[in-house]
Amino acid sequence: MMKAGRFGMSRKFKTPCFIMDKRRLEENLEKLSNIEKESGVKILHSIKSFNKSSILPHIALKLSGMSIGSKRELNMAQKANAKHLHLHAPAFKEEELLLMLDEVSTISFNSLGQWERFSTIASKASMGLRINPNLHLPIPSYCNPNLEYSRLGIGYLEFLESYKKNSNLFRNLDGLHFHALFQSSAQGLMVLLEHIEQHYGEILPKLRWINLGGGHNFTDNEYDVKSFVQLLQKFKSTYSHIELYFEPGESVVKRCGDFITTVLDIVPVAEQNVVILDTSIETHLLDVAIVNQRLKVKGTQSSSTPYFYELTGNTCLQGDIIGEYFFIDKLNIGDSVVFEDMMGYSMVKMTEFNGMENAEFILV
């Protein structure tokens, strides 16, 4: 149990739990809404990053729509009364796609094969293609969609060659989708727009929309909104007919809440203090398991202290290790360990490995 004094409350919460600060969420949504107004673009919330049904309707009120990848996410977005719905997945089953086509606003197919199979189906959806621009950007390989061997999107040279050979194949092409950035500043957008203007001059006049994807660090305190607006104004001065969409993942819930755990035991192993928490990398912190992500822990520092602990989970998996940290104060059984900035890409990945329960979500 932990007392949420840091959130200005006195009641206790059962751990593990995710606690969201609604004031910070509102600040992020207000900033994103202002970016929409200043730049004239439409920002879509990516449900894959955060999908709590109690919060989605409020997000839908503030932003222009949602980005989805499946029938289940479509249902979530519709229940939240989201306006514009953009659909994209690496591949679609025909029977599932037919159920969604008339329910979404825009769709991006991921390959030429899927385009050839499905783009001629009569529907209300505006059809597009996801392109891999093969940009050379400093992005971790596990989430870099620009890699030459990435399965995400058609390589831009392959697309341009196909268009040149048979432009009639793309007669229904309304939009292009570029998801090429990761936690990027406005500089990343500049690189992407330069690529688009350099390579698609023949195609741009015929398009209705471009989806510039996620990876834009909009709600970071250092994000240069002025430069962002200027870049888009320059692009729109030439291509005013093209609607621009962005679908940030983390930006909506960045710095909006933490994950709270409790120390169950402290075990001395080979002259090291191993802390067992009421969580697991397999159940609540899956990105630690998948990509060896290092989490931010409240009350720790990078330099040495007398209180050095290895934080671990409470499952039978030997590799259930969160990481090693220098704490400012000594830990005791029953203490809270707080993982900071944990709203994005966490709850959507929870499992029940080893019988562990899902962590509760609390809005304060």
Question: What is each residue range found by the language model?
Answer:
Residues 231-239:
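Structural alpha-helical segments in enzyme catalytic/regulatory domains
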